[in-house]
Amino acid sequence: MPRLSTKTDVLIIGAGLAGASLALSLPASMKATLLSSGAAPCSASTMALGGLAAVLSAQDSVELHIEDTLQAGAHHSDADAVRNILQAAPQAVQWLLERQVPLDRTPDGQLHLTREGGHSQRRIVHAADASGYAIMQALYPQLQQATQLLQRTNCLALALRRNEHGRVAGVDIYDKQTHRHETILADHVVLATGGLGSLYAHSTNPDTAKGEGVALAWRIGAAIRDLEFVQFHPTCLYTQGPTFLLTEALRGEGGHLLDAHGRRFMPDYDSRAELAPRDIVSRAIAAQMKREDRAHVGLDVRHLGADTLQRHFPRALEEGLRRGLDLRQDWIPVAPAAHYSCGGIQTDLSGRTSVPGLSAIGEVACTGLHGANRLASNSLLECVVMGRAAAQAIEGSRAAHCSALTPEDERSKTAPTFAGSPHTPAPARDNNNNNNNNNNNNNNNNNN
């Protein structure tokens, strides 16, 4: 049976917040296909709890947000990427509001801002303690209504294709419903496949987060950066059942981490105590667990009050009760789990990789924002900012790209084309190479 071939302007592989932001930001004149591997669109974005970090108060400033990001990332971040993405944060929040995302507000109608570890100010906009779910619930119907967008589920991306100019021009897929191999040809291919956390035994990620996007790009020689930096979230519920992440904001609002004797131990490790960045808190918890020969520590939020817990943390309260724990009355057993890949496919600030025709956005990409350790709530922000930036770049380059593969090319193609050795890819940006060379040796211990 001959292989099926279809053609689209933009092929987006991954249906999380990054892919959705791109799809909804493309002009109506461009035909796009949104590919996901599950039976329904599912991603780590729906599991994100905290929110988006953005400077929205008079007490805050972009410079403070930049400094917090650089400190959390052990100064391994790319300074230009940090400044550009964080400066775009208020516009990203406004875009979500225009998309009818129900962000929490104060009684006087202002956006409610919470604080999380590593942040010096309150700057996290959120939807209770299930921000990612609320965002995607608002965006998915809009994706379905976009007439220029074709959504395909149950499809696995197998290999990227390139034309005679070396430009990525399509992808080979396997449709799990029809059991057929197909080729989707595209003028622009965008990887938005998420991270690799489910490679670890204990992870907050969905089962699909196995690093397939990085593998696809690596196989054709795309530059990869900082894969060694995998963030562990400090506070995952330690009970029987699937890993459940307890939002950073529980500590941001004043929650305490306790040892076996009910004593706060974080002040022994860092002056910021529970508000230290995630890598510091995770290492401190691991050290405390080893010292006490225990599999977890305690998280105490009882003093926040039942009203605060019910209003701002309903999901955590509900899940605790479902597992026989009451956050209003009990210490909660918590332990770290693999959470976020800070590295990935190296890109510029429009999502372009080192391989023409291929872009990457979201957790699969490495813009240089996160450095050796991501600052809380900078990831959903990056998804929106980079999704919109990639859409703008694709629209701007529409008339200039090389010709894509055509269905007729299929009959003469025998194997994927590789661009040199994938072990020595060309860098996407020279300044990042300098960053890598200067910082690799100094930062290997920043995210154990």
Predicted regions and their residues:
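Glycine-rich loop(s) and the adjacent beta-strand/alpha-helix scaffold that form part
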Residues: H188-F244, N378-M386
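N-terminal Rossmann-like FAD-binding beta1-loop-alpha1 element of flavoenzymes
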Residues: V10-L34
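An anion/pyrophosphate-binding glycine-rich loop and adjacent beta-alpha core
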Residues: A40, L216, A222-L327, A393
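Conserved redox-cofactor binding core of oxidoreductases
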Residues: R99-H181, L185, A192, H233-Y238, ...
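Conserved N-terminal glycine-rich FAD pyrophosphate-binding loop of Rossmann-like flavoproteins
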Residues: G38-L70, A74, Q231, G241-T247
